Amino acid sequence: MSFLKDLEEKGYCIIDNVLSQEEVEISLNSFHEWFNSYSQIKESHNKVSPHGIFKFFEVGHQRHAWFIRTRPAVLDVFKELWKTDELVVSFDGSCYIPKDLMKKDNIWTHADQAPSKKGLMCYQGFVSLTENKERTFVVYEGSHKLHEIYCEEKKLTDNKNWLLIDHDYLDKIKDTKRVLHVKAGSLVIWDSRTFHQNQYGTLPEDRIVQYISFLPKKQRTSKMFEKRFKYFTEKRTTSHWAYPVKVNGLQPQTYGNKDLLIDYSKLVPPKLDDLKEDIIKLI
């Protein structure tokens, strides 16, 4: 399949029409229903969510997230990637940048694989519910092949799965920078070694995506399962790594503003009963 070749050569791929138009509309409706279900979600989003990325408010376990994760076409792509029908999924968050929010872009290009990890370890991605030409995903083509070289050059050896890339290094590879045109219903996947970031751009576009990542179940230990099941029942949001699990905190950085503290007792529980059978298979 062409997307496998793209991932190997470019470090990323775009697969159009993974969700049907109907599935996109269902997901959008679910997202907006959740977003408007509690006033603090909307009021605090741009204050506590860097680059529009939701990490709080139990976002990783809302209906739109689980609906997308359990779509057969989404699963089929990752089954093909990992050559197995047995997968586990991350409890990752979403990104929402409304079209009326305009910000100056900063360079925060990074890789999500630690210097201590060599070779292909994880594919991460998102399903887009909006079409975006400029308020979108930025990637450096082929940079997954530079990850180990960069870490050796900078003498980096730590095991944190978040690696900020120096601006001077990015300038050397600027010709490989790609600003992706992503259509609604598309699945974007990248090797976790690939250098990437979001950008606001200059066009007033809504951007809504659900981050998504699967790993083979065969490497999930019983201890990992216990931890994952615990975080599922507690509706905790995690990083894009399905394992080892890295859970996000419950509260954002408030800088002394108590109004930003989240009252989880006021959140509306997601309705997942019709998806439960498929969800359990992915934990």
Q: What function would you assign to each model-found segment?
A:
Residues 109-122, 175-176, 182, 205:
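A short beta-loop-beta micro-motif enriched in histidine and acidic residues
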Residues 116-133, 181-184, 189, 213-216:
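Short, conserved beta-strand element in jelly-roll/cupin
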Residues 2-9, 16-116:
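Non-heme Fe(II)-dependent double-stranded beta-helix
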Residues 132-197:
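Double-stranded beta-helix
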Residues 12, 120-126, 134, 177-179, ...:
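Extracellular structured ligand-interaction cores
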Residues 93, 111, 123, 127-131, ...:
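Short, structured patches in soluble enzyme cores that scaffold and shape functional sites
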Residues 40-44, 193-283:
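Non-heme Fe(II)/2-oxoglutarate
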Residues 19-21, 95-96, 114, 130-134, ...:
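Short, solvent-exposed loop/turn segments at secondary-structure junctions
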